[in-house]
Regions:
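Cytochrome P450
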Residues: 1-419
Length: 419
């Protein structure tokens, strides 16, 4: 599969281009724009964000080598100073700093270390039968059906139950948690924003209030009766001899559940779309399951679940020939760096034999994704079981995208399950 070039408005001078304009994200990331930026101005300044006029401008980092540099230099590019999303105004900084993804060392390292033992490849592999059982049970619900939506009826319930089992969330609450996460992370999409996209702050505040209320109930229960789930780990964690505060526990919970819900769902759905649009590639993977691990890596490369994460410059510095001032936002665009022509031949083509290195989990450094082993195992099982159960699966309609410059994922993927 080679993705068609996206149509775009008449190109302004690249120096005046606003990367986060809604028009660029209606059908997924603006890959043609990113290609132009990598070629002409790989570290690019956007002066303003139309939908949030009060927001400060930001630097876009689009080339893989530059993303690698920013990701590994936390002393120059801080997660804690300004948070990890580009628009400060829609997510309170005190909440961002309560997640270890929004911290700098040493606190980041100490908090993340509490979970690393539970996310090693060996520990995650021990859950393979459990995860496969979850995926099979989700597919069983489609028995007798001719059509379904792979996003809402396969990906979402499967990943919600997997992360829910790790966190101690009752299965009957999976759908409610998934809806809250979708609203909190994709409030600029009208389908997730009942208050309207012009009221993003109110939408996020409403979702976060419900998240705090629900999570506080779980926290109280585990203080009363500790369990062996990750929520209990957060409740009983100590960093520098101090228990985590309530909002830190809630935001740690939020981070793990949000990542568990969105990352695998996004990459599986887009990976399946790529296979469905290239029947030759689909047939190769269906007929030779040994190609599934490479398919997983190629899907991660082409379709990273999160389009960007942000850092803030701690001092004046130079990157890609551009002078960056202390306090300015620096945005790493994984949706661009994973298609960098200097690293990948024909980067817009989905190739199950490529088995690439990529930056879908970050580009190394302190914030490399904690859940890589879990995501890879979930994706492997989802691809295996879907193609084994439905060898003749095909597209049944036009996929739709979440309208977001942060989440890189499909909102719907209608398919015909049988020939």
């Amino acid at each position: 599969m080679t993705e068609p070039s996206q149509s775009s408005p008449t190109r302004k001078d690249l120096e005046q281009e606003r990367v986060l304009e809604r028009e660029h994200w209606m059908d997924g990331p603006p890959h043609e724009l990113f290609k132009e930026m990598r070629g002409k101005c790989p570290v690019h300044w956007t002066s303003e964000i139309t939908e949030v006029p009060a927001a400060a401008g930001f630097w876009s980092v689009t080339a893989a080598d530059d993303v690698h540099t920013v990701s590994r230099d936390w002393e120059t590019y801080s997660s804690e100073l300004g948070g990890v999303v580009v628009i400060d105004e829609v997510f309170p900084i005190e909440l961002a700093r309560a997640m270890f993804i929004g911290m700098d060392p040493p606190k980041h390292d100490r908090l993340k270390a509490l979970f690393q033992a539970g996310f090693t490849p060996k520990r995650i592999a021990a859950h393979e039968d459990e995860i496969r059982e979850i995926v099979v049970s989700v597919l069983d619900r489609l028995e007798g059906r001719d059509n379904c939506d792979l996003v809402t009826e396969v990906a979402q319930p499967a990943v919600s139950r997997v992360i829910g089992s790790f966190m101690g969330i009752p299965e009957e609450d999976d759908a409610a948690w998934a809806e809250l996460m979708n609203t909190a992370l994709a409030a600029n999409d009208s389908d997730y924003s009942p208050e309207g996209v012009e009221n993003i702050e109110e939408t996020i505040q409403r979702a976060m209030t419900q998240i705090f209320d629900r999570c506080s109930t779980m926290i109280a229960a585990r203080r009363e009766n500790p369990t062996d789930d990750l929520t209990s780990v957060l409740v009983n964690a100590e960093v520098e001899g101090q228990k985590l505060e309530e909002h830190e526990i809630v935001m740690g919970f939020f981070l793990l559940v949000a990542a568990g819900n969105d990352s695998t769902k996004a990459t599986y759905s887009s990976g399946m779309r790529a296979l469905l649009e290239d029947r030759e590639q689909l047939a190769m993977v269906r007929d030779d399951p040994s190609l599934v691990p490479g398919t997983v890596e190629e899907a991660l490369r082409m379709f990273p679940a999160f389009a960007h994460f942000r850092r803030t410059a701690t001092k004046d510095t130079v990157l890609g020939g551009q002078e960056i001032k202390k306090g300015e936002k620096v945005v790493m665009w994984y949706a661009s760096s994973n298609r960098d022509e200097t690293r990948y031949e024909d980067p817009d083509r989905f190739d199950v034999h490529r088995n690439p290195e990529h930056q879908a989990f970050g580009a190394g450094g302190r914030h490399f994704c904690l859940g890589t082993a879990l995501a890879r195992l979930e994706l492997k099982i989802l691809f295996e079981e879907t193609l084994a159960r439905y060898p003749d699966i095909s597209l049944a309609g036009r996929p739709t995208f979440v309208e977001s410059g942060f989440l890189n994922q499909l909102k719907s993927l209608p398919v015909k399950l049988t020939a």
